[in-house]
Swiss-Prot record:
InterPro entries assigned: CofC, Nucleotide-diphossugar_trans
Protein name as catalogued: 2-phospho-L-lactate guanylyltransferase
Family: Belongs to the CofC family.
Function in brief: Guanylyltransferase that catalyzes the activation of (2S)-2-phospholactate (2-PL) as (2S)-lactyl-2-diphospho-5'-guanosine, via the condensation of 2-PL with GTP. It is involved in the biosynthesis of coenzyme F420, a hydride carrier cofactor.
Record note on quaternary structure: Homodimer.
Pathway where it operates: Cofactor biosynthesis; coenzyme F420 biosynthesis
Keyword terms, alphabetized: GTP-binding, Nucleotide-binding, Nucleotidyltransferase, Transferase
Source domain of life: Archaea
Listed NCBIfam families: F420_cofC
GO biological process: F420-0 metabolic process
EC number(s) recorded for this UniProt protein: 2.7.7.68
Length: 217
């Protein structure tokens, strides 16, 4: 069991892959750039968590440093590691993915204040982008595959009050080139500044707006 020392702040676990992240952005970013951009998104998520009065904990697949944020290296599978955090832990716990570049203080607080035993913010394609559980020992992680459906079913079967969080900022994970326009429109932090500094700009694509980068059209 892992004990969080958080001075009454809710701990928020942020799973993060620092090496070879975001492969679907390979069409427009180099390997090094993908790692840099993923780190910028992590910084934005950490800031959102801190601004909501919570204590971030980065759960990384390789060593990483970000200011004073504690980092734990993922030595088992994600589900096994999170379940280890939860075992015997009566305290609240949240899990927020590192690619939610649009997340802000308000979105995190919406997750934490739903009033349910288990609050789930779905992601595209049946994934789970963020979770809050009132008592960590009541939860078992079901990530990968149709994790949203599995988490809802687990909470329902366990007799928990399950709340579904309808939040665009928590729903919109950044995985592909077409997602980058959302960063331009809705992000005001590190991720947007990084894109601008690397030559990205808003462009019309047929009947929709998107982003372009000179030399990558």
């Amino acid at each position: 069991m892992v004990t969080f020392v958080s001075e009454m702040r809710i701990p928020v676990v942020i799973p993060y892959k620092p090496i070879q992240p975001k492969t679907r952005l390979s069409c427009i970013l180099t390997d090094e750039e993908r790692e840099d951009f993923a780190f910028m998104m992590l910084r934005d998520v950490v800031n959102a968590v801190k601004n909501a009065g919570c204590s971030p904990l980065i759960l990384a697949t390789a060593p990483v440093e970000l200011d004073d944020v504690p980092v734990r290296i993922l030595e088992e599978g994600l589900n096994e590691t999170i379940n280890g955090f939860c075992e015997g832990n009566d305290e609240p716990l949240a899990i927020v993915m590192a690619d939610l570049a649009l997340a802000d203080r308000s979105a995190i607080l919406t997750l934490l204040t739903s009033g349910g035993d288990l609050a789930i913010a779905p992601g595209r394609g049946g994934g789970t982008n963020a979770i809050y559980v009132r008592s960590a020992k009541m939860f078992q992680a079901q990530y990968y595959g149709m994790s949203y459906e599995k988490h809802v079913r687990y909470g329902t079967d366990a007799g928990l009050m399950v709340k579904i969080i309808d939040s665009f900022r928590l729903y919109c994970d950044i995985d592909e080139q077409d997602d980058l326009i959302e960063v331009f429109i809705h992000n005001t932090g590190y991720s947007r500044e990084w894109l601008i500094s690397h030559g990205f700009e808003i462009a019309m694509k047929k009947s929709r707006i998107g982003v372009k980068r000179p030399g990558y059209e």
